[in-house]
């Protein structure tokens, strides 16, 4: 049975710039916002945009990510006419090969895409924080009779050299793509979100690989090839909150912005919920000694200290005399007595002993998943 649009989430990134936080976890599986993982935003956008069939292409350290996604039930992707499929590298008669780029990952999964038989494919990155209506983007794609639509957003011109930049005509037709140009001509940055007519993209990928001219990356290879061939390539302008959380600084910044309930993410918006897979935990327990200001505290937490402008995920134990400020603490962490944590990210299941100071001064301080720092005489 044919479907109108298939979602493909590229979730195999190693995320080396996140250091300790991606040592054993794929970047899209890194926790965010107290109860989410980064990939929840792309999956929730699909669910809210009526994209009911989604393939998640994984590669690096997929176990946590696979367990989190499961059968897709938290996002409503487990119905008769919907589904989420985990797509990992595999062996065939031609041998086995790791994905060598974004478009190569799609090429390696042509058989899955053909089984879904979509008219359009929606290509997404699994490591961005944003809320977006993909149906509106598809309508723009169809109205313009585009072969490829690239979602873009305006960035300050002085920062444009950090992005892939789309140069357009007066009708937003893309006439040139520049990857991180030293002297950008435009401030329209690619968001790594694409809608392709599947029949044409399939043809381009197959022709390239069959003729020994591999097309490995959407930004570096596919978009320039489409423009050079005179295809209808258009920019779709997105206005809203969007953050690439691929560095420690950007992850920390976005986490702190998440504490502002008036930000453009608006997690309280019932019309566009962000869904996630969460284990059932006991209610949080707040002692009479707790001092809290502008913070998110998850289920299962025991807090007996001071929490200021911070996020505490689920099942965190904070003992007496401890102060946490401007920090993101991931789930399962134990923090002892008289600890000071400021401008930091603490990974899942870490153990912080008594009287320890973790203070990010010139840069954000990071404690990895399961890392132990100091000793605690009363660990529970």
From Swiss-Prot:
Catalytic EC class: transferase
Residues noted as binding alpha-D-glucose 1-phosphate in the record, renumbered to the chain: 164, 179-180, 190
InterPro entries listed in its UniProt record: ADP-Glc_PPase (IPR011831), ADP_Glu_pyroP_CS (IPR005836), GlgC_bac (IPR023049), GlmU/GlgC-like_hexapep (IPR056818), NTP_transferase_dom (IPR005835), Nucleotide-diphossugar_trans (IPR029044), Trimer_LpxA-like_sf (IPR011004)
Listed GO biological process terms: glycogen biosynthetic process
Function of the molecule: Involved in the biosynthesis of ADP-glucose, a building block required for the elongation reactions to produce glycogen. Catalyzes the reaction between ATP and alpha-D-glucose 1-phosphate (G1P) to produce pyrophosphate and ADP-Glc.
Annotated NCBIfam families: glgC, PRK05293.1
Quaternary structure and interacting proteins, as annotated: Homotetramer.
Protein name in UniProt: Glucose-1-phosphate adenylyltransferase
Biological source species: Lactococcus lactis subsp. cremoris (strain SK11)
């Amino acid at each position: 049975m044919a479907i109108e649009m298939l979602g493909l989430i590229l979730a195999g990134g190693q995320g080396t710039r996140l250091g300790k936080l991606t040592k054993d976890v794929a970047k899209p599986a890194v926790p965010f916002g107290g109860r989410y993982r980064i990939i929840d935003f792309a999956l929730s956008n699909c669910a809210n945009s009526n994209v009911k069939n989604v393939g998640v292409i994984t590669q690096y350290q997929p176990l946590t990510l696979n367990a989190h996604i499961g059968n897709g039930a938290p996002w409503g992707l487990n119905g008769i006419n919907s589904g989420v499929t985990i797509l990992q590298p595999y062996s065939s008669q031609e041998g086995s090969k790791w994905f060598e780029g974004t478009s190569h990952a799609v090429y390696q999964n042509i058989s899955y895409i053909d089984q879904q038989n979509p008219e359009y494919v929606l290509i997404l990155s699994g490591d961005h924080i944003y809320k977006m209506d993909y149906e509106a983007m598809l309508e723009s794609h169809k109205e313009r009779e585009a072969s490829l639509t690239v979602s873009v957003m305006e960035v300050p011109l002085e920062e444009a050299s950090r992005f892939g930049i789309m140069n357009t005509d007066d009708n937003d037709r893309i006439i040139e793509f520049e990857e991180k140009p030293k002297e950008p001509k435009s401030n329209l940055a690619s968001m790594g979100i694409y809608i392709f007519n599947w029949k044409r993209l399939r043809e381009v990928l197959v022709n390239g690989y069959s003729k020994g001219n591999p097309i490995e990356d959407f930004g570096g290879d596919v978009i320039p090839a489409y423009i050079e061939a005179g295809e209808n390539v258009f920019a779709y302008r997105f206005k809203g909150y969007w953050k690439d959380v691929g560095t420690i600084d950007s992850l920390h910044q976005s986490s702190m912005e998440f504490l502002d309930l008036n930000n453009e993410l608006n997690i309280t918006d019932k019309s566009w919920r962000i869904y996630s897979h969460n284990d059932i935990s006991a209610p949080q327990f707040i002692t009479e000694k707790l001092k809290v200001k502008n913070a998110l505290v998850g289920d299962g937490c025991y807090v007996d200290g001071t929490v200021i402008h911070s996020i505490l995920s689920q099942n965190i134990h904070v003992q007496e005399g401890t102060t946490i400020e401007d920090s993101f603490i991931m789930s399962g962490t134990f923090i002892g007595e008289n600890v000071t944590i400021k401008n930091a990210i603490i990974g899942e299941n870490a153990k912080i002993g008594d009287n320890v100071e973790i203070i990010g001064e010139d840069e954000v301080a990071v404690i990895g998943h399961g890392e132990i720092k100091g000793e605690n005489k009363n660990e529970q």
